[in-house]
Amino acid sequence: MEVKDILKTVDHTLLATTATWPEIQTILDDAMAYETASACIPASYVKKAAEYVSGKLAICTVIGFPNGYSTTAAKVFECQDAIKNGADEIDMVINLTDVKNGDFDTVEEEIRQIKAACQDHILKVIVETCQLTKEELIELCGVVTRSGADFIKTSTGFSTAGATFEDVEVMAKYVGEGVKIKAAGGISSLEDAEKFIALGASRLGTSRIIKIVKNQKVEEGTY
């Protein structure tokens, strides 16, 4: 698989709590230069970022992040506010307390409400796979499919672990037609990125791939 094809799947990500505007600018510049799928940044930077890229790059942001236990009304407002400010894609975190209580209907209804708030914008649902049993993950594949969301996403990158090959395999087997998979968290090599894609992921959330590509270009004397 060519590097440029891997880069097209990447949501180039900076969600650090201490991220500065110059750091966000670098993320945006690199994402545009390497033609990634989007740049994923904190909601507080969305308006400024959207103005900065001026339609040359999709802007993704996160809501209910990273713990997911804010109310549905709060998440809906976050979504509407982000879109008003120029976000093209929304990555939401589900409420894991509902999952652990076995209340999957509430999880589904929340996703439906946020999808309605997204209108025609892309919605990715973060299920935080490292906190789930296999049975819970399988159930959530059905929930996300029925909800009308566009993607199921493995991880926030802020919990105990990120994406695993095994979890993406489960998602690919049990998610419904029309729902795509985003693997995120801990993707640190082009080889891993390619394997996640081969297993069924069509988006990768990572901050490292562009750095790897840059280093390769330096080593090859082409950058």
UniProtKB/Swiss-Prot annotation:
Pathways per UniProt: Carbohydrate degradation; 2-deoxy-D-ribose 1-phosphate degradation; D-glyceraldehyde 3-phosphate and acetaldehyde from 2-deoxy-alpha-D-ribose 1-phosphate: step 2/2
Record bears the keyword Lyase: yes
Pfam families linked: DeoC
EC number per UniProt: 4.1.2.4
Enzyme class: lyase
Keywords on record: Cytoplasm, Lyase, Schiff base
Catalytic activity line of the entry: 2-deoxy-D-ribose 5-phosphate = D-glyceraldehyde 3-phosphate + acetaldehyde
Gene3D superfamilies named among the record's database cross-references: Aldolase class I
InterPro entries registered for this protein in UniProt: Aldolase_TIM, DeoC, DeoC/FbaB/LacD_aldolase, DeoC_typeI
GO biological process: 2-deoxyribose 1-phosphate catabolic process; carbohydrate catabolic process; deoxyribonucleotide catabolic process
GO cellular component, one term: cytoplasm
Keyword Metal-binding carried by entry: no
Molecular function in Gene Ontology: deoxyribose-phosphate aldolase activity
Active site: 91, 153, 182
Subcellular location: Cytoplasm
NCBIfam families named in the record: deoC
Chain's role: Catalyzes a reversible aldol reaction between acetaldehyde and D-glyceraldehyde 3-phosphate to generate 2-deoxy-D-ribose 5-phosphate.
UniProt family annotation: Belongs to the DeoC/FbaB aldolase family. DeoC type 1 subfamily.
PANTHER family: DEOXYRIBOSE-PHOSPHATE ALDOLASE
Protein name, per record: Deoxyribose-phosphate aldolase
Origin species: Streptococcus agalactiae serotype V (strain ATCC BAA-611 / 2603 V/R)
